[in-house]
Amino acid sequence: MTALRVLFRCFEGCPGEWPLSLIDTRCPRCGGLLDVVHDEEALATRSGAAWRALFDARRLSAQWPMPSGVWSKREWVNPELDDEDIISLGEGFTPIVPMPTLGRALGVANLWIKQCGHNPTGSFKDLGMTGLVSQVVRLRRQGAHIAAVACASTGDTSAALSAYCARAQVPSIVFLPAGKLSDEQLTQPICSYSQTVALDTDFDGCMALVAAFCSRHGVYLANSMNPLRIEGQKTLSIEIAQQLGWQVPDWVVVPGGNLGHVTALARGFALQKKLGLTDKEPKLLVAQAAQAAPLYRAYRHSWQFQQTVAGPTQATAMAIGNPVNVRKAIAALQRVDGVVEAATEDEITRAWTAGDRHGLATDPHTGVALAALRKQVEAGRILPHEQVVVISTAHGLKFGTLKRAFHLMTDPPLASATTQADPAAQAANPTTLRNPPLRLPAHLPAIEDALLPKLT
């Protein structure tokens, strides 16, 4: 294979190309988003069958860094990196699990869940962060002055950044909206010794502040406006096809917050088809919480986007009113005739409890995706016989406090406005799904009296 080139170009089409050594990963001309552009002609000198064989062989290899689901596809991520640059915690190659009983409950016969919560820090964000932090290590080794790496976060990005920077021994800073994360999510950057800053604003406010801070003080920005994150995350699409025998599902359902994830998946599926690894691209369904659904509103209004103020939602990573990657996401969805759906808080709660009831440790964001899937099946857009993969973006253990509070009724999840106002809706409130422990005396007759009626 010929040498592989990779560079930055402006997503908006400004003339010029820039190396990946750029510290401020915004277009130098317009200040907008950049894309990572690969030498697809060089990549195409290897056939689709040869790429499949290479990726399959690497999946079984113990030679570092091939056990990483990202770096086993290194030519498609960042071919400039040397082995000594790569910072990996063993991300990727997470399970993809058939869920027939849950699928039947949702109205589809062929449902699969891609368990991104099995990544090192418990979410899909690790796939992008390994690529970004590895590039920072390369730049610092080459003499670039990068004092630290920073991000704004609603939880999972901060966990990934802090862990990968700790592995690389690079200082990290995270800006968090005070009181908007689960206890478990807040614990992660603290325990990785990231400098953690809680601000009295929402995610959008944190994003504006961290971008300004980075540009003024030689700090490298790690949010998904940095396209290196997208390149790592796009390997998830390759994993899905690879784990399904190099077949592409009919639908992929992905939760949407800052919208880097759907952008990455679309890029990965498109490149696989272009290089001949697969013969089609899936249809994409982006799922948003109704309290924070700017992309859904744009979809319902001919893709005309307007920034909103996100309301409170248990799907905290979606509490974003001005997603950084919205223009990229809209372009990707328009290209594949994608769909956007929104779920109310009650629908979210019902969905994640359904996932739990069928054996998943379901986080609220996956609950949003399951609720959106149900609504699109009921609308007739997703057909019962079609194969559907739902991206479970994070592990339910990150939300143990929320789940425990729901079941113990100490602090139930937010209720939708319709539920609060409608007595009939209150009767169907998902709090009826709670499963508190039974407190019983330590006597067999009392235990039998309580349990035997439940076994009939």
Model-assigned labels for residue ranges:
Residues 1-456:
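PLP-dependent amino-acid enzyme catalytic core
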